[in-house]
């Protein structure tokens, strides 16, 4: 077995005596977070993050150490409603914004720092019906109340959505509400009228509601085969007009923990994964084709999971300019786990937004490099010092009043930086002569690449759908009297890429039409398929397959063709720039669009992450985090400045989460399934499930087996819908009213499918053998699943088997849970209630009962074991297992007013181990 975790004396020395300390007031509110930073052997720098709260306990402002110590305004200032929701937010990074909610908790109006406003209208069932931007209608939604077509199952479903990209129609659903047909029409160039072409995608499911086949908009079909455990077993592709299936993934095997162990790609390439037994971290990855190794990767980590290095045994050591150049990459971190040094190999030239020219496949003209990184006290990357073929320093200038940052040029000072951003914190230009244009929703709309003497410009333009995802991209360039336009239309599993040319004074003609299929593989494997209907390059075969092998953060390292020959390879700097790449032909490599972190690289050099854009040569985002403070008070920082260990899948970032079942029973298993169903419904990866020991793990797998048998029954959908809906709501009308918030009706009807997925994808670990608790990091969350009662110091199952908070705390301690700023979320009923207040009015003050809330009891037991940085989160009221269908981002929902009451997000109460128990205080329950 692989041994991947190594002692790292350098990191240990830098982290010595650098705790994170949270200070609470007498209301148990965190008013200070103190961190200690050290890069070398110097004295630790104390950094204090400050938070203040109103007399009702709601946030007023938050400041990081840099702005607070320099006397600047707080990073964030809030004005909250009486129920505690932030109605006005003033951010130094993102500007001032306001938002209003209706009585159901849905947003009805918002305004950003530029004065752009949105209004949201709802129908009588409280489903989103229209959106207007700055007073102009931008979205319309139509539901199937009257448009009844036999066999189409359209009643109550979303039928048509007119959005900023055009129109999406969904004319047919399965009986259980699964989408069968989706049609997209794009807006024309005038931005007002629809194109006549309708692109239709079709979905096919098995009896369990699992997607088995997708037919894309041009008729290509891809299918997947599952094993008896519901895990992916194979994938195939059938080109439109063909009867033959091409294997993309021939076979795949898993270990007992559900991790990929062995896979065979469609081109015969074999990948073998080996994991460290104690941590389940990937230790080695060997990839071979018949007769030749392609990759022999070994990974090393420090004890907390930071990547220390990666070596590739297939790369021979060579010497250039008296320096060894090999396949080894190393990393070092400071006391806050920010990357401070990295080594690797590169080709000649300074990193810019442009790609270097590709080398021949067998070229050995590479040099070793070392990069060191400097950060300021607010977590901003302030300098990159590069030692290599061409030494240089890339300096950044950070605003004195915010975290906005520009690359140093022409004597730029901190006072000048804010002029490079608009009031909402959106970058105004990539460089001189390259302005950026933003739409009213804060989405990048235009990038000007070059301005010509005749007044024309080379530009890239973008359009987005109603969910904020990119639907079209158009690159327009002008050379030698000819305008060339390259347009990409994004469809489910398919990109349509068309190129037209227009000579001055002439008419446009299409010179290339490419269908690019994005096909999922497994593990580190992904596949692209290229089909030309016009303009096929002479040196590239049509209907070609490209197999891409990725690194731990998803970056494409090695690209192979259908015969397993190398098409290209690429190496990256830690923050995403291309350090070196090689290709067997310039023509082939021009069709490589997905690179760093598995994201598409645009002509500007920016990477499109879905919710925002990333500039790899700057190591930061070009606009503030739409998720707010999910990754801290710095809204521009990339993955906590730890880009080799952490990955941001969509432009947001947060800690890891785990589900922990202290007791195993059918009811608690259902809770775990519901938790992961919620995550799948909002396109998040399911959490791993932690159990005490192997016996509990075997018991859970036995229960899961019984559940899967029941899930194969034809009545499963109706049973689940009945349990989720009619047991929770009293009438059809109330169900539709409560579940009809925008896309919530789709969440409800598609839940059975995701329940099956949550069951089949459930990965379990026992804390005795995996040592997973010892690997928890700052900001990680441990969700405790069980039943509970107000004022009771224990958790239990439906048969009244119970575990005391003392035993629960000791078990976490016994299995080496670290004393870090992580959160334990008690998901039982009434975990913040010292008495049963489930029928209380929306806002009630509770004062000093003798009993302690369950979360408070667990906090006290952890304190007895010398935990001081862990936080325990409790929730008011009796939890609703499927309440997330009403509020998909809520950790805990409850009913106020009994069985006929209102379903609302529970207010959480945080009990910090830094503060001893108190018998008084005030708790406010929020609707």
Residue ranges and their predicted role:
Residues 1-49, 54-55, 175-178, 184, ...:
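Thioester-forming pentapeptide GCGEQ
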Residues 24, 32, 46-64, 170-173, ...:
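Carboxylate/His-rich catalytic cores and anion/metal-binding grooves
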Residues 40, 68-76, 86, 93-94, ...:
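Acidic/glycine-rich beta-solenoid
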Residues 537-610:
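A motif-centric feature for acidic-aromatic and gly/ser/thr-rich catalytic loops and repeats
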Residues 564-581, 590, 605-606, 611-612, ...:
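Short turn/helix-capping motifs enriched in Asx and small/polar residues
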Residues 654-810, 915, 922-927:
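Glycine-rich short-loop/terminal segments
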């Amino acid at each position: 077995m692989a041994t991947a975790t190594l002692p790292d004396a350098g990191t240990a020395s830098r982290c010595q005596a650098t705790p994170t300390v949270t200070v609470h007031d007498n209301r148990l509110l965190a008013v200070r977070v103190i961190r200690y930073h050290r890069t070398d052997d110097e004295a630790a720098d104390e950094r204090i993050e400050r938070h203040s709260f109103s007399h009702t306990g709601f946030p007023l402002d938050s400041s990081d150490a840099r702005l607070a110590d320099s006397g600047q305004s707080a990073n964030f200032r809030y004005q909250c409603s009486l129920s505690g929701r932030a109605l006005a937010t003033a951010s130094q990074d993102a500007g001032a914004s306001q938002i209003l909610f209706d009585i159901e908790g849905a947003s009805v109006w918002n305004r950003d720092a530029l004065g752009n406003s949105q209004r949201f209208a709802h129908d009588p069932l409280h489903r989103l019906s229209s959106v207007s931007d700055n007073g102009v209608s931008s979205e319309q939604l139509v539901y199937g109340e009257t448009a009844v077509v036999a066999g189409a199952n359209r009643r109550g479903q979303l039928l048509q959505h007119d959005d900023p990209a055009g129109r999406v129609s969904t004319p047919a659903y399965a009986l259980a509400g699964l989408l069968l047909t989706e049609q997209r029409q794009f807006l024309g160039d005038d931005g007002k009228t629809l194109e006549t072409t309708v692109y239709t995608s079709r979905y096919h499911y098995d009896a369990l509601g699992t997607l088995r086949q997708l037919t894309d908009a041009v008729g290509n079909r891809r299918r997947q085969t599952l094993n008896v455990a519901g895990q992916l077993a194979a994938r195939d592709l059938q080109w439109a007009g063909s009867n033959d299936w091409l294997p993309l993934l021939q076979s795949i095997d898993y270990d007992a923990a559900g991790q990929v162990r062995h896979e065979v790609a469609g081109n015969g390439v074999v990948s073998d994964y080996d994991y460290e037994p104690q941590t389940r971290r990937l230790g080695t990855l060997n990839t071979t084709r018949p007769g030749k190794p392609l990759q022999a990767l070994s990974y090393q980590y420090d004890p907390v999971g930071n990547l220390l290095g990666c070596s590739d045994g297939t790369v021979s050591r060579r010497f250039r300019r008296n320096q060894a150049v090999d396949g080894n990459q190393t990393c070092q971190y400071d006391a806050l786990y920010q990357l401070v040094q990295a080594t690797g190999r590169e080709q000649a030239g300074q990193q810019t937004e442009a790609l270097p020219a590709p080398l021949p496949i067998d070229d050995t003209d590479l040099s070793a490099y070392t990069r060191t990184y400097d950060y300021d006290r607010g977590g901003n990357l302030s300098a990159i010092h590069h030692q290599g073929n061409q030494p240089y320093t890339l300096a950044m200038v950070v605003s004195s009043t915010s975290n906005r940052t520009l690359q140093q040029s022409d004597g730029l000072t901190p006072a000048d930086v804010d002029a490079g951003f608009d009031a909402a914190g959106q970058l105004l230009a990539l460089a001189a002569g390259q302005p950026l244009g933003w739409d009213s929703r804060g989405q990048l709309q235009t990038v000007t690449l070059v301005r010509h003497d005749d007044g024309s410009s080379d530009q890239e333009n973008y359009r987005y759908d109603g969910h904020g995802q990119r639907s079209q991209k158009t690159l327009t360039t002008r050379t030698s009297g000819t305008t060339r336009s390259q347009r990409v239309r994004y469809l489910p599993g398919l990109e349509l890429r068309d190129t037209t040319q227009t000579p001055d004074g002439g008419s446009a003609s299409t010179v290339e039409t490419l269908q690019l299929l994005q096909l999922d593989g497994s593990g580190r494997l992904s596949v692209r398929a290229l089909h030309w209907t016009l303009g096929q390059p002479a040196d590239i075969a049509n209907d070609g397959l490209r197999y891409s092998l990725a690194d731990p953060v998803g970056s494409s390292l090695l690209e192979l063709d259908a015969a397993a020959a190398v098409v290209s390879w690429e190496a990256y700097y830690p923050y995403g720039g291309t350090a070196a790449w090689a290709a067997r032909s310039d023509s082939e490599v021009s069709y490589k669009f997905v690179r760093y972190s598995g994201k598409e690289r645009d002509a500007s050099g920016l990477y499109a992450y879905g919710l925002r854009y990333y500039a790899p040569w700057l190591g930061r985002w070009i606009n503030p985090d739409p998720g707010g403070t999910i990754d801290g008070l710095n809204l521009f920082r990339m993955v906590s400045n730890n880009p080799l260990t952490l990955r941001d899948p969509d432009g947001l970032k947060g800690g890891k989460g785990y589900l922990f079942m202290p007791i195993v029973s059918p009811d608690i298993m259902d809770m775990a399934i519901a938790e992961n169903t919620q995550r799948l419904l909002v396109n998040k990866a399911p959490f791993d499930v932690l159990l005490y020991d192997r016996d509990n793990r075997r018991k859970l797998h036995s229960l899961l087996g019984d559940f899967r048998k029941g899930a194969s029954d034809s009545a499963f959908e109706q049973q689940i819908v009945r349990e989720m809906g009619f047991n929770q709501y009293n009438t059809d009308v109330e169900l539709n009213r409560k579940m009809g918030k925008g896309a919530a009706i789709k969440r409800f009807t598609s839940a059975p499918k995701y329940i099956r997925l949550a069951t089949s994808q459930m990965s379990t670990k026992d804390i005795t053998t995996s040592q997973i608790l010892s690997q928890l990091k700052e900001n990680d969350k441990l969700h405790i699943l069980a039943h509970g009662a107000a004022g009771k110091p224990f958790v239990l199952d439906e048969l009244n088997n119970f575990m005391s908070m003392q035993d629960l705390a000791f078990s976490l301690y016994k299995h080496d849970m670290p004393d870090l700023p992580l959160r334990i979320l008690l998901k039982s009923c009434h975990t913040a209630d010292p008495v049963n207040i489930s029928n209380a009015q929306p806002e009630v003050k509770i004062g000093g009962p003798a009993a302690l809330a369950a979360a408070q009891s667990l906090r006290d037991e952890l304190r007895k074991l010398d935990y001081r940085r862990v936080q325990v989160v409790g929730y008011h009221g009796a939890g609703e297992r499927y309440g997330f269908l009403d509020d998909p981002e809520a950790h805990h929902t409850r009913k106020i007013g009994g069985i006929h009451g209102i379903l609302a997000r529970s207010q959480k109460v945080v009990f910090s181990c830094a503060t001893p128990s108190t018998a008084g205080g005030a708790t406010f329950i929020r609707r």
